[in-house]
Amino acid sequence: MAAWLSGLLHDVGRFEQIRRFNTFSDADSIDHALLSTEILFGTKEDASCGRIRQVILDPSWDIYLYKAIKYHSAYRLPPDLSEMEKTYCQILRDADKIDIFRVNLETPMEDIYNTTTETLKQAEVTSEVLQAFKERHAVLRALKKTPVDNVVGHISLYYE
């Protein structure tokens, strides 16, 4: 139940992100995963503003949903997760990666990366991004500087 619901709900923050900032880029706006948790579970200041009870009445799944959604786009999972929390986080992260790969197969690169094919072909992969790729792990968002760094970053998700 929690895995299915987290898959349905994890990107609700994207709608607010595009409304507020006119972009899906977390680097250029706000962390959409954190925004999703605020929309669903409220804020520290006001948990009553969350909308999760409009979707599921049983609060016993909340901790798994909250953590899976909050950390689905994090570079690394926090080490203090319980085994069950970690499992739900990994399920959602893997499903999200599969969706990213699907989008990259079905959508023109110009639309995904908001640049021209020529710019992508001429851009160079920065040394930090190349190093992360060679080390066979995901690329930290802050390291991506050129348009092609984003492509390499998506490919590197395979290693995680």
Residue spans of the language-model regions?
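Acidic/histidine metal-binding catalytic segments
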Residues: 1-5, 47-70, 85-91
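An active-site-proximal "capping" alpha-helix that borders the catalytic cofactor pocket
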Residues: 30-48
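His-Asp-centered metal-binding catalytic motifs of divalent-metal-dependent phosphohydrolases/nucleases
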Residues: 1-25, 36, 40, 65-75
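Divalent metal-dependent phosphate-bond-processing catalytic cores, especially two-metal-ion Mg2+/Mn2+ enzymes
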Residues: 1, 9, 20, 74-160
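Post-HEXXH active-site segment of zinc metalloproteases
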Residues: 20-34, 110-113
